Amino acid sequence: MKAAIIGAMEEEVAILRSRMEGCEETVIAGCEFSKGRLDGVEAVLLKSGIGKVNAAMGTTLLLDHFRPDFVINTGSAGGFLPSLRVGDLVISEEVVHHDVDVTAFGYAYGQVPGLPARYRADEALVEAAKQAAARLDGLQAVTGLIATGDSFMNDPKRVEFVRGQFPELCAVEMEAAAIAQVCVQFGTPFVIIRALSDIAGEESGVSFEQFLETAAKHSAELVLSMLSVMKQKRY
């Protein structure tokens, strides 16, 4: 079993890198890869950089150079469900772009022509993430839709527009759909697991800066718990 784990920022990968044994680091086109063993599991950790282009480029390099069995995207997100609070965990069932609009030609909002309207996460990975979350005391986890766009969601009008397009939306962030799109095209199983650093809206920028470290810690804890579950289940 070879795991690939992607985070956009240093804060989102630092804890996992510090836990890696036999870590070998490589930089390709600005993407930082760390290869080793994470709690006994062969793993490659990628710090991709922020945004969809960086995420897509990094994921492509990751899959082409390292050939992992599956991809986990970890990090922070902004919450959309009223029941969610900062620090809560969101596990993807589906992922969608919230800033793609080709509806003039009959496509669903968020759909890239020639590709699915939404990208479904691997069911076995989702189940492993849910079991892993249940082992973490004091953390709420939900499973559902995550949406991606190249903008930070602190504009209330934009928040309401996106909520109108995707009423069931759990969280928003800036890389997941790009990672999912590349994984789908490569035929590589994926799941997105994010911890909330903010609740999308006017004060989200302040909250993000204040709680990024907490969100990164919770998300990393879920990744490690998930790898433990998968090792036991012989994924």
Swiss-Prot record:
- Reactions performed catalytically: S-adenosyl-L-homocysteine + H2O = S-(5-deoxy-D-ribos-5-yl)-L-homocysteine + adenine; S-methyl-5'-thioadenosine + H2O = 5-(methylsulfanyl)-D-ribose + adenine; 5'-deoxyadenosine + H2O = 5-deoxy-D-ribose + adenine
In terms of SUPFAM superfamilies, this protein maps to:
Purine and uridine phosphorylases
Q: Which organism is it from?
A: Geobacillus kaustophilus (strain HTA426)
Q: What EC number(s) is this enzyme filed under?
A: 3.2.2.9
- Gene assigned in the entry: mtnN
**Record family assignment:** Belongs to the PNP/UDP phosphorylase family. MtnN subfamily.
The yes or no answer to whether the keyword Amino-acid biosynthesis is present is yes
Q: In which pathway does it act?
A: Amino-acid biosynthesis; L-methionine biosynthesis via salvage pathway; S-methyl-5-thio-alpha-D-ribose 1-phosphate from S-methyl-5'-thioadenosine (hydrolase route): step 1/2
Question: Per UniProt, where does substrate bind?
Answer: 78, 153, 174-175
Task: List the protein's name.
Answer: 5'-methylthioadenosine/S-adenosylhomocysteine nucleosidase
This protein's GO cellular component annotations are: cytosol
